[in-house]
Regions:
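Arg/Lys-rich, positively charged N-terminal/basic patches that mediate binding to nucleic acids
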Residues: 1-32
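Short proline/glycine- and basic residue-enriched helix-capping loop/turn segments at helix->loop/beta transitions
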Residues: 42-46
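Basic/aromatic recognition patch in beta-strand/loop cores that engages polyanionic ligands
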Residues: 49-79
Length: 97
């Protein structure tokens, strides 16, 4: 199983995604979306180079698309550290700076 750790800011991102999902799509769909995110986090932890280079925002940063969100992460000795999970419509530079 791929090791991953979430930044405190990413934990807030996920809470907000979950709340938005409940309000707009219902509890079941929101839960499924968050479960899918966590499954992808594990996969990325096992395959750290799966994402694309995102070093234009921060050195060694990588990104991977999940449905309508972009996951930004850094490789660690044991897997990955997930910095942010942002909606694709957001200004990444503003939220990663």
């Amino acid at each position: 199983m791929g090791a991953y750790k979430l930044s405190n800011t990413c934990k807030i991102d996920i809470e907000e995604i979950y709340e938005y999902g409940i309000e707009n799509f219902g509890l079941t769909q929101a839960q499924d979306y968050i479960l899918g995110l966590h499954e992808l986090f594990q996969t990325l932890g096992e395959n750290v180079n799966s994402g694309r280079d995102a070093s234009e925002f921060f050195p060694s940063l990588r990104r991977f698309t999940y449905k309508s969100h972009m996951i930004f992460y850094l490789q660690t000795k044991s897997g990955i550290f997930i910095v942010r999970t942002l909606n694709q419509s957001m200004d990444y530079k503003q939220h990663l700076g």
